[in-house]
Amino acid sequence: MKSYMAKPNEVERKWYVVDAEGKTLGRLSSEIATILRGKNKPEFTPHVDTGDFVIVVNAEKVALTGKKLDQSFYTYHTGHPGGLRQVSFRRLLAEKPESLVYNAVKGMLPKTRLGRQMLTKLKVYAGPNHKHEAQQPEALELL
């Protein structure tokens, strides 16, 4: 018997809504990355994007343990000479909470073309409202 290999046009995708309120950032992100990759499905195939869509709401209320708010940073470069920048988690949570969750999940996905394709299925919103009601997403309780 041959092993099953999913084909991109055969993959059925679901939509899930995850409430980030009170959830720990790293634990939440690893669960979301698993769903985006499709590793929770029996038809998982490493070279095909078999994952589902994930909508994260209440990103502004995500929890960070310890002193991570002040001691952890995301580093990026503007592309100009001397353009290395760092932003603390506290500042990021205050200004753009969506990017905090987005970057945490991004770091847990493959750094390839397929990983970038998987990341397009992640939708993050700071508040409780989202604009994907037409897709009839299922509420997903993580942890």
From Swiss-Prot:
The keyword Chaperone is assigned to this record: no
SUPFAM superfamilies: Ribosomal protein L13
GO terms for MF: mRNA binding; structural constituent of ribosome
Alphabetical UniProt keywords: Ribonucleoprotein, Ribosomal protein
GO biological processes: negative regulation of translation; translation
The keyword Ion transport belongs to this UniProt entry's keyword annotation: no
Alphabetized Pfam families for the sequence: Ribosomal_L13
GO cellular component: cytosolic large ribosomal subunit
Function summary: This protein is one of the early assembly proteins of the 50S ribosomal subunit, although it is not seen to bind rRNA by itself. It is important during the early stages of 50S assembly.
Assembly and interaction partners: Part of the 50S ribosomal subunit.
Family, as annotated: Belongs to the universal ribosomal protein uL13 family.
Protein name: Large ribosomal subunit protein uL13
Organism: Alkaliphilus oremlandii (strain OhILAs) (Clostridium oremlandii (strain OhILAs))
Species lineage: Bacteria, Bacillati, Bacillota, Clostridia, Peptostreptococcales
Name of the gene: rplM
